Amino acid sequence: ELGNSLGILAPNGAGKTTIINMMAGLEKPDEGTIRKTSRVSFPLGFMGGVNGKHSAKENCRYIARLYGLNPDYVESFCRWVCGLEEYFDMPVQTYSSGMKSRFSFSLLLSIEFDIYLIDEGMPATSDAEFNRKAGNILQERLKNATVIIVSHQAQTLQKFCRSAAVLMNGQL
């Protein structure tokens, strides 16, 4: 149900990333089928579509074209949210892990999905301005979209999710 954000709590090694990847269409289930009737995001932090040899600018424009969006809009949105300044025009492979997290989350938020997939919570960053912007945008999106967060930390799920499920021994 759109707008009803779900948290999936599970210990390490229980299959959290696998279930998120299956929801995104990056992995196939061993049995059964997954049917998508909504626009489902790539998982937050998934850098599979990002080419490390290219700048954030080039990656934004490429991803925008893949999704049929205005490249100028996606680029300016990501520049504003992630605040990488001159680094935005440098190869992503030169970024620190925090910079990659900010870019990845900005890219995810630049595209309107019905369902946003987040593996292990929000990106850890000490940039207060980024945290404020990204948090506000995510809260706004929660009004019309669902966020599915998988984590081993209950407090992460409590902050963003209205309901939760437990993944244990392969059973949800």
List the predicted regions and their residue ranges.
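ABC ATPase nucleotide-binding domain signature region
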Residues: L2-R65
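Conserved H-loop
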Residues: G45, A145-K159
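H-loop (His-switch) and adjacent beta-strand-loop-beta switch element
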Residues: F160-L172
